[in-house]
C-alpha cells in the first residue's frame, strides 16, 4: 500500500494532499494561536484579514495586489481552452498528442490499463469548468470592486497552480488521452441522468455565487453603479443573513457537484479535498475578522454552513 502511495505516477495526489495538510495546519495556527509565529498568519491570510499585519514584514513587502486574482482565471481559462483543443483534435486524429505530453500526463496519477474518465464525461466536465472559470474572470474584471488589499506571493502562486492543475487533473485520467487502447468517442448519449443532474447543480451554484459577487460589489457602489468607496462593510440579505461567506460555501458546492459528473475520477477528489479545506478555513478566518472589526456584527450568523459552522 505504501509503495502504491509514493509511486511516481501519483505526483498530483501527493502534491494536493501535502498542500491540503500544510494549509490545514497553518490555518489552525492562525485561528488558535496567531501570535506564536507571525509568519504563519501572514502566509494564510489575504485581503481584509491581512490588512492588520505588520507592513514592514518580509511577507508584506513581497505581496501582490488582491486584484491579481484575475491572473488565476486567465491562466486557468487558457489551460482549459488548450485541453479542449487537444480533445477536439483527438476526436479527428487519435495520434494527435506527441509522446512528451503523454509521458507528462502519465506521471501525474496512478497507472491504469483503462483510465477512469470516459471521453464524453471529460468533455462535459471541462466545458462546465470553462464556464465557471470564465465567469470568475468576468467578475474580477467587470463586477468586483477591489480596494488596495494585498495577498502574499505564496497565496498567489498556489492560486495559479490550482487553476492550471484543475483541468489537467481530468485530462490525465481521460480514456484515449494517455492510452491508445480506446477509441476516442464523444457523444451526448453517453451522459447519464446523474451526470446531467450534477451539471444542473453546478450551474445553479455558479448562478448563486454570481449573485453574491454582485451583492458584495454593490456595497461599494452608489445608486447609479458608480464606485462610492473602498471600505469594508457588512452585507445583509439572502444568504448573508445566515453565513458570513456564502461565496465560499457555493465554491465548495460547485466542486462537489462536479463529482456527480465525474464520479470515477481519482485525482479530482484530492482537488475537492483541497478546495473544501481552503474555503472552510478562509471562511472561519474571515468570520473571525468580522467579529473583531464590527462590535455589532450579527451574533447568530455562522461562518460557512447555515446553523452549523
Curated annotation (Swiss-Prot):
Transmembrane segments: 12-32, 71-91, 114-134, 151-171, 248-268, 270-290
Bilayer topology: Multi-pass membrane protein
Major localization listed first in the record, in broad terms: endoplasmic reticulum
Keyword rRNA-binding: no
An individual GO BP term: dolichol-linked oligosaccharide biosynthetic process
Subcellular location: Endoplasmic reticulum membrane
Role: Plays a key role in early steps of protein N-linked glycosylation by being involved in the conversion of polyprenol into dolichol. Acts as a polyprenal reductase that mediates the reduction of polyprenal into dolichal in a NADP-dependent mechanism. Dolichols are required for the synthesis of dolichol-linked monosaccharides and the oligosaccharide precursor used for N-glycosylation.
Protein name per its UniProtKB record: Polyprenal reductase
Organism in which the protein naturally occurs: Caenorhabditis briggsae
The organism's taxonomic lineage, starting at the top: Eukaryota, Metazoa, Ecdysozoa, Nematoda, Chromadorea
Amino acid at each position: 500500500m505504501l509503495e502504491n502511495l509514493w509511486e511516481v505516477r501519483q505526483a498530483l495526489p501527493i502534491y494536493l494532499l501535502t498542500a491540503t495538510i500544510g494549509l490545514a495546519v497553518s490555518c489552525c495556527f492562525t485561528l488558535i494561536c496567531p501570535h506564536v509565529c507571525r509568519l504563519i498568519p501572514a502566509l494564510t491570510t489575504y485581503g481584509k484579514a491581512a490588512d492588520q499585519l505588520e507592513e514592514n514584514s518580509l511577507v508584506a513587502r513581497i505581496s501582490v495586489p488582491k486584484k491579481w486574482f484575475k491572473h488565476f482565471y486567465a491562466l486557468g481559462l487558457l489551460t482549459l481552452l488548450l485541453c479542449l483543443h487537444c480533445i477536439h483534435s483527438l476526436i479527428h486524429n487519435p495520434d494527435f498528442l506527441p509522446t512528451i505530453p503523454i509521458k507528462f500526463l502519465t506521471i501525474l496519477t496512478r497507472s491504469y490499463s483503462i483510465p477512469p474518465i470516459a471521453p464524453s464525461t471529460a468533455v462535459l466536465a471541462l466545458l462546465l469548468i470553462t464556464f465557471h472559470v470564465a465567469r470568475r474572470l468576468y467578475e474580477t474584471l467587470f463586477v468586483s470592486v477591489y480596494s488596495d488589499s494585498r495577498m502574499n506571493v505564496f497565496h498567489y502562486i498556489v492560486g495559479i497552480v490550482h487553476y492550471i492543475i484543475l483541468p489537467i487533473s481530468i485530462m490525465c485520467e481521460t480514456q484515449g488521452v494517455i492510452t491508445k487502447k480506446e477509441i476516442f468517442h464523444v457523444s451526448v448519449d453517453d451522459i447519464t441522468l446523474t451526470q446531467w443532474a450534477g451539471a444542473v447543480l453546478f450551474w445553479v451554484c455558479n448562478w448563486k455565487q454570481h449573485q453574491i459577487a454582485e451583492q458584495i460589489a454593490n456595497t461599494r457602489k452608489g445608486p447609479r453603479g458608480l464606485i462610492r468607496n473602498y471600505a469594508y462593510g457588512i452585507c445583509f440579505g439572502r444568504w448573508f443573513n445566515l453565513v458570513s461567506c456564502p461565496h465560499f460555501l457555493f465554491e465548495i458546492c460547485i466542486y462537489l457537484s462536479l463529482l456527480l459528473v465525474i464520479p470515477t475520477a481519482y485525482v479530482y477528489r484530492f482537488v475537492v479535498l483541497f478546495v473544501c479545506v481552503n474555503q472552510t478555513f478562509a471562511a472561519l478566518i474571515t468570520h473571525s475578522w468580522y467579529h473583531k472589526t464590527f462590535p455589532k456584527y450579527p451574533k447568530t450568523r455562522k461562518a460557512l454552513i447555515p446553523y452549523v459552522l
